[in-house]
């Protein structure tokens, strides 16, 4: 039996953990603190699949009719 990957499903946008350098850039761009980012739980199936841990920030790249692609950021919480 093969394991199904959530990330391979067409309805699931691309998720990836960002580096500290990219995080600093995002926070300064939006003039916010890390804790002000929207949240995603560490128990979320996609969080588990990408190996996210509490405190990581995940970039979600979604298709957009107006922008082509749009990035969203989520702070991983317990």
From Swiss-Prot:
EC number: 2.7.7.6
CC per GO annotation: cytoplasm; DNA-directed RNA polymerase complex
The entry's keywords: Cytoplasm, DNA-directed RNA polymerase, Nucleotidyltransferase, Transcription, Transferase
Pfam family, any one: RNA_pol_Rpb5_C
GO molecular function: DNA binding; DNA-directed RNA polymerase activity
Main location (coarse class): cytoplasm
Top-level taxon: Archaea
Enzyme class: transferase
Subcellular location, record wording: Cytoplasm
Listed GO biological process terms: DNA-templated transcription
Catalytic activity: RNA(n) + a ribonucleoside 5'-triphosphate = RNA(n+1) + diphosphate
Family: Belongs to the archaeal Rpo5/eukaryotic RPB5 RNA polymerase subunit family.
Role, per record: DNA-dependent RNA polymerase (RNAP) catalyzes the transcription of DNA into RNA using the four ribonucleoside triphosphates as substrates.
Subunit (UniProt): Part of the RNA polymerase complex.
PANTHER family (UniProt xref): DNA-DIRECTED RNA POLYMERASES I, II, AND III SUBUNIT RPABC1
Protein name: DNA-directed RNA polymerase subunit Rpo5
């Amino acid at each position: 039996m093969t394991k199904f990957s959530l990330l391979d499903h067409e309805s699931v946008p691309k998720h990836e953990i960002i580096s500290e350098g990219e995080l600093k850039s995002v926070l300064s761009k939006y003039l916010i603190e890390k804790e002000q980012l929207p949240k995603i739980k560490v128990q979320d199936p996609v969080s588990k699949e990408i190996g996210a841990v509490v405190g990581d920030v995940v970039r979600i790249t979604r298709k957009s009719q107006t922008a082509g692609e749009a990035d969203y950021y989520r702070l991983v919480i317990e």
